[in-house]
């Protein structure tokens, strides 16, 4: 699909490129049951668990009045692989930034299993 990427996902993609420069962010866009479109069932591995935690983190952020995590931009910086959320973020932006920052760090520490890329969600993620 060639729909424009929501702005926040553009920032999240850049965060992933900061912590995992050796991989394309697209490797994380369709992985396991939770990375990308999915969001049900049992995570297939540690990396998928990172995405489940990220999904739950966004759900928590939605409890902040008017906060829409997928569209919320925030201010952050990447310095030599270290991500910092900046102090000028409002409550929503700060929460979403931290969700993305923690997920990008989690991705960097989790093994990547090629067999879990683009799996059959219906069969594996009930």
From Swiss-Prot:
Record-level GO cellular component terms: extracellular region
List of catalytic residues: 54, 100
Subcellular location: Secreted
Keyword Disulfide bond: yes
Reactions catalysed, as given in the entry: a 1,2-diacyl-sn-glycero-3-phosphocholine + H2O = a 1-acyl-sn-glycero-3-phosphocholine + a fatty acid + H(+)
Protein keywords: Calcium, Disulfide bond, Hydrolase, Lipid degradation, Lipid metabolism, Metal-binding, Secreted
Cofactor requirements of the protein: Ca(2+)
Disulphides: 18-78, 33-125, 35-51, 50-106, 57-99, 67-92, 85-97
Residues the record lists as binding Ca(2+): 34, 36, 38, 55
GO molecular function: calcium ion binding; calcium-dependent phospholipase A2 activity; phospholipid binding; signaling receptor binding
Cofactor binding summary note: Binds 1 Ca(2+) ion.
Keyword Hydrolase on entry: yes
Primary location group: secreted
Organ and tissue specificity: Expressed by the venom gland.
EC number: 3.1.1.4
Assigned protein family: Belongs to the phospholipase A2 family. Group I subfamily. D49 sub-subfamily.
Function as written in the Swiss-Prot or TrEMBL entry: PLA2 catalyzes the calcium-dependent hydrolysis of the 2-acyl groups in 3-sn-phosphoglycerides.
Annotated PANTHER family: PHOSPHOLIPASE A2, PHOSPHOLIPASE A2 FAMILY MEMBER
Name the record gives this protein: Acidic phospholipase A2 3
Native source organism of the sequence: Naja sagittifera (Andaman cobra)
Lineage: Eukaryota, Metazoa, Chordata, Craniata, Vertebrata
